[in-house]
Structure formats: C-alpha cells, structure tokens
C-alpha cells in the first residue's frame, strides 16, 4: 500500500532450492516448476495499492546476496452471471424536474457495451448540459485508517453546443486519465423526450470489480448521471455496476467456484 510503504503483505509464498551450497564458477541454468499454484487474486496497480506476483531468484553469499525479480501479471477470468438485472432509477425536483434513466443490465464484462436510455418525464428547467461518467472508487485499509479515492475514467458530456473534446481530469491522482466528451443531445430537452445511451467499454482502462481483496482493498465502479442547468445547479444520481473479465474465446471456462459474480 502506497500510504504504508514500509510494510508489505504476503498472501502467497512458495520456495524451491535449485542448487546445494557450492561454488558457481561459470554460467549455469537451473530449471524450476511451481505446479498448480492457486492465484486467487488478479494483479492490480491502483492509486494507493499494488498487488503483484513475481518470481525472485536469490543467490546466497557470505557477503551481500544477489537478488533478481521478474513480475508476472495475473488475470482472473469469470463466466457471465446467470442473473443480470437491469438498473432503473430517477432523479428530480418536485414540480420542476423528473428524469428516469435505465440501463439494460447491472453487470458487464470489460469489452461489453452499456446500453440504456434517459427519459424526461417533467422539464421545467432549462438544462444546459448533461454528463454521463464511469467512476472508479478505490477503498484501502480498514477503519479508522481507511482511504477512499475516486477517479473519473470516462465522461460523456452532453451540451447544447457540439464540442467534441479531449481533456485532462481535474482531480489530482497518481494515475493519468483522459476524458472523452461527446454530444448526444442538441438543445434543452422537452417533456417526453428520450435520449439513448450506448457506451463501449473496450477502449478504456478498466479493471474488474474487486471486493475486500485479502481484506486490504476494494475497487468499485459507478455510472454517474449529472445534469447542470443555466444557473449552474447540479442534479446527479449514481448507480453501482459490476465489471468482470470474460475469458477469451477458446479458453476453458473459469473454475466453478468463480462462476457467480457477487452482488453487493
């Protein structure tokens, strides 16, 4: 954990002795094999935490040891969940604004497409623009020493002026992200208007959802809808989605114990 750099937490450790004590006078090759190692967590490089697998070779000497390390990146694949319900929520102000939004499902693989719609039931405010964002929230540590960091990975900006743009995020983070701004609405919406949503996830740097990994950290994703009126007032609603890594075509299915994607 980056805020606790002095401590490292091992969750897996296997050791093999490749050669008995002796003299090494010329180049020599030693073979090794760690069989059927269960790697229960996926590799992760976040804002405040890093989970890594690596091979370490150590040559013990009377003086300083010679140590070399090689990182291994581990993916954890899942199969699609049997139950995948849609998300339906609304946001509004009494007698001024009432908007309903719907997403076709709540769990997505990392190359999936988010399909949904925004439906305006009541509009008595002049909406300047809307934003649809994917937010990653990383929680590390345990209470009372718990840290929460949020970063916006994707932001679709909807305005009454067509300005496709690329810009840097406004928050301070150790990770550099890019915002993608696209127009999906021209002018202020009227009552009964429906705006479709179609967001392709494959082009963005996303990880699966992680929950209580080794009781050290969690990573969750949220779809955030924000509306801003002419007076710069903001109305927003967030809904959690679950992301998982789908096994490539032709790869054997994930293990049975990983079949069901957990639901918060």
Feature roles, as predicted:
Residues 1-264:
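C-terminal beta-sandwich interaction modules and adjacent acidic
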